[in-house]
């Protein structure tokens, strides 16, 4: 079950996200970053946001550390988008990962990006117990990315 949760970015976080997005647009990936482009669910216009692309167990995933963001809502509505890095564009279909399958993906995400996202997860650390991660899993949508 998904629990509605959203952590609004601070001014400093918006500035940092803008910097990461600019770097990704010119082809520089900061520790796996990409620009996610997805059509707006109401406007149909392309909307972009920097994201961390997780490669885990032979698949690619997008995790929403801030919860029910606009990109999450748009991706749920469209089911597809693009990951951009410089001039490269990877069109994909998105499948939301169910609660029963989130644990290993969230654990891998936290292991890689804990330093960056810890403030969005109410956890003791990246090596938190399974039960602790399962408790907050509903607040953080996860999508499998299939080219």
Where are these regions (language model features)?
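N-terminal short leaders/motifs
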Residues: 1-13, 35-40, 89-100
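Short, flexible segments with low predicted structural confidence
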Residues: 15-17, 46-47, 81
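Intrinsically disordered, low-complexity segments enriched in polar/charged residues with Gly/Pro
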Residues: 22-27, 38-41, 61, 68-70, ...
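Short, flexible turn/loop "capping" segments at secondary-structure junctions
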Residues: 28, 54-55, 85-86
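Short beta-strand segments
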Residues: 31-66
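Short, structured beta-strand-loop surface elements
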Residues: 59, 66-146
